[in-house]
UniProtKB/Swiss-Prot annotation:
PROSITE patterns: RESPONSE_REGULATORY (PS50110), SIGMA54_INTERACT_1 (PS00675), SIGMA54_INTERACT_2 (PS00676), SIGMA54_INTERACT_3 (PS00688), SIGMA54_INTERACT_4 (PS50045). GO terms for cellular component: protein-DNA complex. Disruption phenotype: Deletion leads to loss of motility due to the absence of flagella as well as swimming defect. In addition, mutant possessing pili adheres poorly to mucins. The keyword NADP does not apply. Keywords: ATP-binding, DNA-binding, Nucleotide-binding, Phosphoprotein, Transcription, Transcription regulation, Two-component regulatory system. ATP binds at residues 158-165, 221-230. Residues 130-359 form the Sigma-54 factor interaction domain. Residues 4-118 form the Response regulatory domain. This is Response regulator protein FleR. It comes from Pseudomonas aeruginosa (strain ATCC 15692 / DSM 22644 / CIP 104116 / JCM 14847 / LMG 12228 / 1C / PRS 101 / PAO1). GO terms for molecular function: ATP binding; ATP hydrolysis activity; cis-regulatory region sequence-specific DNA binding; DNA-binding transcription activator activity. It comes from the Bacteria. One of its GO terms (biological process) is positive regulation of DNA-templated transcription.
Amino acid sequence: MAAKVLLVEDDRALREALSDTLLLGGHEFVAVDSAEAALPVLAREAFSLVISDVNMPGMDGHQLLGLIRTRYPHLPVLLMTAYGAVDRAVEAMRQGAADYLVKPFEARALLDLVARHALGQLPGSEEDGPVALEPASRQLLELAARVARSDSTVLISGESGTGKEVLANYIHQQSPRAGKPFIAINCAAIPDNMLEATLFGHEKGSFTGAIAAQPGKFELADGGTILLDEISEMPLGLQAKLLRVLQEREVERVGARKPINLDIRVLATTNRDLAAEVAAGRFREDLYYRLSVFPLAWRPLRERPADILPLAERLLRKHSRKMNLGAVALGPEAAQCLVRHAWPGNVRELDNAIQRALILQQGGLIQPADLCLTAPIGMPLAAPVPVPMPAMPPATPPSVEIPSPAAGQDASGALGDDLRRREFQVIIDTLRTERGRRKEAAERLGISPRTLRYKLAQMRDAGMDVEAYLYAI
């Protein structure tokens, strides 16, 4: 289900970044550069939410809020304010603002507020947590809930697509820090020369293009939890700096001389065997032991047969809502195919299969052919290859030692991460060459401007501060 949002922001770069975020979230929007320009748009179109900056030339966000409250009393308004102006934002909520965001903020924080105020959805519900009907999954979830109550560092291992970030978010939600930020940063998706400034922040003038100081992800997560996703992809040089942050619980921005104290909980994920990476010299041994205080191994989907259908039903509900479909159900034969499939791509592959089936199904009942599990769309469908069901695990809690990854997993995972990182680097380099001009950059890349906007939104969703590091050396 999509919201229709009116975005009011005078800063062009930020307006484009917010537009990209709304686009990635699947929402409709109209973006204007002033409160004065917003008024005629409001008069001719219906919106489910207004997102407005506070400090703008001419009519500011507070004045716009007052007019909207008078003319459109049921239209929620979300205000964006600078770090030092929180008091005024709180006062605006007393005057009728639905909520506020303090800059800089994560894309997920914006999308959560859009879902809450425009669509009436509460983020972090049961529909977002781990599915654990398999006995081994339930036991692992119990361990996760127990360690959540402490501040211990947790290392979550598992194949790509198993839902490691979902488990990490569950640990955060079960912890005393649940009401504080949860910041996830994908170490595999960000080019090496941008990762340090993304994690630790930078001061004004610390490199070419650093026109203003920016806090890093560690600072943004202060008081809450930071997730270092795919930590095994972090360069060795940066691993030493991360080790110091974990030991001292303080961070130094790039170009700064004074450290900043942190109150933070650290979680990390990996799809590799970190012990083997240490032995091969690709990962620091001291950092490995600092991270693996409490290791958890999230099993691949093929070893969690009891979780497959509940996951499929959840994904069916989720994507049915997004596609504005009526009631759609899994047919018994389709359900059997799902349980028998090997799922080399894990939950991510299951998600894709459900989306395909919703597009292809007719009459509200998904059949095996709609899933396209064993052949590309348009090719004859072969019978699914059955996999042997694993034996029932013992009643005692499972070991939390990190298992070796499945054969072939490292190569495919590393290849995918490397290709994504190279793609992002090519996009950044092309934008530098074109001095930030998106239309020209898209032409040089051979893609449409809309595709470029989507790629930039993906980069921001992976934790990259595109604007801040566009001209970084």
